[in-house]
Structure formats: C-alpha cells, structure tokens
C-alpha cells in the first residue's frame, strides 16, 4: 500500500466515514469524499494566500499589494490610476498583473493578486467581495479625418463581439439612419482597435474611459456619445483581506476615483450632413 492510501484509511477511521469506493481496477469518491475534497480546496487556497503574504513580508520587510486588471482596463486606465495613487500614498509599494477575468479570480484565491479590476463578471464565491464602481459611457470614435457622420458609410466598423457593443450598434444605426454593413471583427485589445482607427482602417464603439486621452490630443475624433451610461467596473478582492491597510487604502482610492473624467474637454462632435 502507498503512503497516501494508508493516510486516507487513517482519515476514514478517524471520521468514521468511507471517503473512497475501491475496486480492483479503480476508485471513485463517495459523497462524503466529494464534500471533503471541496472543503480541502478552500483550505489549500487559504494556505497558498498565507504563503504568498509571508513571502511579500519576507522580501520587502513590509506589506506590498498586488493589483490585477483585465487588458481592457489595465492598458488604458490602470497606469493613470497608479500614478495618482502613488502621489497620494508614496509609501505603498505594489506589483501589477494584467490577466483575463478567469485568471484574475484564480490568482485572487491563491493570494498572488490582492485586488482585481475587471468589467462586470458574475462571481459566485462567498470568499470574494465585489464592489461596483461608477457607471461609464460608451462613445463612437473615428479617425481625425472624419468630418460628418455620412462618411462612416464608406469605412468599416471595427467590432468587438460583446453584448453592449451590439446594443449600442443597433442604437447608433437608428441615430444615423443607415445600416453599418461594412464590418471587421477584432478580437484583440482596445489598444489594437485604437491603433487601427488612427491608421484609418475604420471606426468603433468603445468605452469613453479608454479613448478620452486620444480624443483630448486630437488623435481620435469623438463622433457620438451615448447619453445613457450603464456599464461599470468591478473591484474584486478576498473578504478576509479588505481591512489590510494597503488594500483598504487602494479600495477607498478607487471608490473615489473619477473614471469618467466628466470635466475633460471633448472634441466637438461631428454632425450628420443635412439633405
């Protein structure tokens, strides 16, 4: 018998429950075994978080926060957030991770990431706390050479396949009064889409937070700003960590941070040609 089998039998004897159904060829977990496995996963995740926290303290002699974000938030927004956070809290050190949503949740539970910023994402986990931020608007942006809405009929729509993009696309077609049949699907990041627009390959419907700097500089032209804002960020963290000093300060900073930048000057919207 292997050492593992011996330990499992000892555990079964201690609990008074059969954890594994055995036969000559294979085995499977009993109901009790499956429940114990689920609970043990939580224990291992907590141990992993503890080990990662101790490594940070050992390496930096003080607390250090690890901040994660999805690509669509991390590339256009996170650098600006961290510059302003550093001005307010220069003593707090941090690491940054740019991952997809699933990876961020995994790293949160393992303790390699303390806080994650992501688009709305359903998370059903009692250990995880989700804080909703302010709403932010979507806009239509094009290259700086565009002077009226009718010109959009001649260039492709660069389209991200998301529910909100499809919704705002339908609304925009009603506003301009013609169908946007020329389309290019783009599976890359928002930064990729912005570069394609700058190079004159099309226009796009994007969150305003991701393009407002280019609009201010005149690198992109604001074609239309939708009046209703209904999408938002999520600040995601492990509940047991929310009172740690560096984490609580960063969360408070994010809750007060104005992503929309409503006071930022906008380029005058282009008009639809009168007929």
Predicted regions and their residues:
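A short LG(V/I)-centered, amphipathic sequence patch enriched
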Residues: 12-31
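Alpha-helical linker/hinge and terminal dimerization helices associated
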Residues: 14-15, 36-58
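Central regulatory/effector-binding core of bacterial HTH transcription factors
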Residues: 62-123
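Hydrophobic hinge/microswitch elements
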Residues: 100-105, 109-112, 178-223, 227-229
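Flexible hinge/capping segments at coil-to-helix
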Residues: 128-166
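Secondary-structure junction motif
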Residues: 156-179, 244, 251, 260-270
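A late-sequence structural motif
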Residues: 223-265
